[in-house]
Amino acid sequence: MKKVSEIMAQDVVTADPSLPVPEAAKMMLKEDVGCLVVMRENKISGIVTDRDLLACMAQGHDIQKCSISNHMTSPVVSVPPDTLLINLAKVMAASQIKRVPIIDGGKLLGIISFSDIADDMDDQVADMWSEWLQLVAVTKTSAQHRRGRRFNKQNKSHARITH
């Protein structure tokens, strides 16, 4: 079983809690990320997602006056790097979250998304299918070879009878 440390993204985009919502949206767009980990004094104080920013606008807030601290999720669900992917997937499903920071000794090491886990599982499933197809091919070739030997024996036997 894989651990989160094996597939986590190590480049985490962080932001100060006072960052205005429009600046956060620009940062997410520029960095091509769906969330920012909000840090206060080198500690995680929250996480804000693109959906949180959309909700802020949809609720009619004056986004020029809103900071991300007003719309972030806190406290943050986080896990250590040795957490098994399957266990993290269960936590994410139970908590209904899509992104989880990876923390060790209070230090932010990375972040992992549900799609990272799904992509990795797709790779694992593809590998299993590949192995299975190879096994089927070997088994089929072996079975054809055995049938061929039987057919040859039957023909030789038949040939002896007719001569």
Report residues per predicted region.
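A glycine-centered beta-loop-beta connector
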Residues: 28-31, 36-51, 92, 100-115
